[in-house]
Design a protein with these regions (language model features):
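Structured, basic alpha/beta domains of bacterial-type, RNA-associated proteins
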Residues: 2-108
Length: 108
């Protein structure tokens, strides 16, 4: 198992209940593929640099996970099927960032 960080951008108009459901479905997916979610951080609603699927804002979430690298493509496929996720990116890291990250801290 190797370390990965996964960032998901959800549609901005989702209720907190739907966001929680997407979050739990994602965690279940990762567990089903033999991975483990170590930490997660909600970055909240942020402006997008450019429009994605007609959205100018997105709700960001970060997941730190350990998973077999061969299973990342399966995770990507399941994320592509989730209609409430407008973009996602999983990257391999040597070690996980300490939380809270800069993105997760409130602006002054």
């Amino acid at each position: 198992m190797q370390h990965f960080e996964l960032v998901c951008i959800l549609k901005p108009d989702l209720t907190s209940q739907i966001q929680s459901k997407v979050n739990s479905n994602l965690e279940k997916s990762i567990n089903d593929f033999g991975g483990k979610v170590l930490n997660q951080e909600i970055w909240g609603l942020k402006e997008l640099s450019y429009t994605i699927k007609k959205n100018k804002k997105g709700f960001y979430m970060l997941f730190q996970l350990d998973i077999d690298p061969k299973k990342i493509s399966d995770i990507n496929k399941s994320l592509n099927l989730e209609e409430n996720i407008i973009r996602h990116l999983a990257i391999k890291v040597d070690k996980h960032e300490k939380l809270p990250t800069i993105m997760g801290q409130p602006k002054n």
